[in-house]
Amino acid sequence: MPAHSFRIAAIPGDGIGLEVLPEGIRVLEAAALKHGLALEFDTFEWASCDYYLQHGKMMPDDWAEQLKQYDAIYFGAVDWPDKVPDHISLWGSLLKFRREFDQYVNIRPVRLFPGVPCALANRKVGDIDFVVVRENTEGEYSSLGGIMFENTENEIVIQESIFTRRGVDRILKYAFDLAEKRERKHVTSATKSNGMAISMPYWDKRTEAMAAHYPHVSWDKQHIDILCARFVLQPERFDVVVVASNLFGDILSDLGPACAGTIGIAPSANLNPERNFPSLFEPVHGSAPDIFGKNIANPIAMIWSGALMLEFLGQGDERYQRAHDDMLNAIERVIADGSVTPDMGGTLSTQQVGAAISDTLARLD
């Protein structure tokens, strides 16, 4: 019998989040049943543009108090620009979660699966398998700044970037700790110290200082422009890529999955490693209002994000790790069989793909 029950706040959000999140829960429940895990899901209807239209805000005032009692947040997608401007929907929900729950680690796995046509020539399964570790609360995505002389010819816009020693060091430590557990044990630091004369030389200095504590982990630093080029030309050289710049990380974490064939299956985790607050797990894709209601949304990213959630919650518990591995194996087999949605060349519906992965998982040895 399960020794501990994890409580999970399920927030579908907008658009296809409403369609893919139930499939993620379906597969998580199948994994829990197989491996003797106890998961409890409660669904919240806020953090959506429809809620904003009804209440004038994305979430209730006590949202943090409600969610603090949960171990994790399983999130679908947010934004519907025809209803609510993006900066309102994102800053009123997802970015609040990241900052107020100190989810300072953003994890974006990048992996080429069998059966997924690679966008890069002559790449095979195993050539692309790395992780982007992105600082999630600082960098360029701050709300510090303003507009001077607004609506005149002398208008000036200032947007500040924030890099703190605490923020820089803790994301570096997470990245080096992660690399130490991986087979290749290599960290690549994304920088631009030849162009950004203050923040990036500081980042380079802290990276070198952190690396000194990890003699068994090799590392290098690459400027963001050539790093993007090498994602395309030499993806096999990467293992753990660490980024303090939120802007650089945002770009790399979409470029990586695109190089591996599709952003449509890419997962992400927003972690508070100390577990003082719930961590959040979500697909990289957005709410895709244009396909909402057509039952063709790809649920794989949602399901893969659920696997990341189990791995994090388990804290090394073999049952949770096996459940994570089974979910990935089931995803891999379903993709290889061609049992996928139209965006990947298949004919299955959202629910049919979710059912196929759930059934495949149940049959794994």
Swiss-Prot record:
Entries under PROSITE patterns matching the protein: IDH_IMDH
UniProt temperature dependence: Thermostable. Fully active after heating 10 minutes at 65 degrees Celsius and retains half its catalytic activity after 10 minutes at 72 degrees Celsius. Inactive after heating 10 minutes at 78 degrees Celsius.
Cofactor names: Mg(2+); Mn(2+); K(+)
CC annotations in GO: cytoplasm
Claim: Glycoprotein is one of the keywords in the record: no
Catalyzed chemical reaction(s): tartrate + NAD(+) = 2-hydroxy-3-oxosuccinate + NADH + H(+); (2R,3S)-tartrate + NAD(+) = 2-hydroxy-3-oxosuccinate + NADH + H(+); (2R,3R)-tartrate + NAD(+) = 2-hydroxy-3-oxosuccinate + NADH + H(+); (2R,3R)-tartrate + H(+) = (R)-glycerate + CO2
Superkingdom of source: Bacteria
Pathway field: Carbohydrate acid metabolism; tartrate degradation; 2-hydroxy-3-oxosuccinate from L-tartrate: step 1/1; Carbohydrate acid metabolism; tartrate degradation; 2-hydroxy-3-oxosuccinate from meso-tartrate: step 1/1; Carbohydrate acid metabolism; tartrate degradation; D-glycerate from L-tartrate: step 1/1
GO molecular function: D-malate dehydrogenase (decarboxylating) (NAD+) activity; magnesium ion binding; NAD binding; tartrate decarboxylase activity; tartrate dehydrogenase activity
Manner of cofactor binding, per the entry note: Binds 1 Mg(2+) or Mn(2+) ion per subunit.
InterPro entries, alphabetized: ICDH/IPMDH, IsoCit/isopropylmalate_DH_CS, IsoPropMal-DH-like_dom, TTC_DH
Positions contributing to Mn(2+) binding: 225, 250, 254
Magnesium is among the record's keywords: yes
Subunit structure, interactors included: Homodimer.
Listed PANTHER family: D-MALATE DEHYDROGENASE [DECARBOXYLATING]
Protein function: Has multiple catalytic activities. Apart from catalyzing the oxidation of (+)-tartrate to oxaloglycolate, also converts meso-tartrate to D-glycerate and catalyzes the oxidative decarboxylation of D-malate to pyruvate.
Protein name: Tartrate dehydrogenase/decarboxylase
Organism: Pseudomonas putida
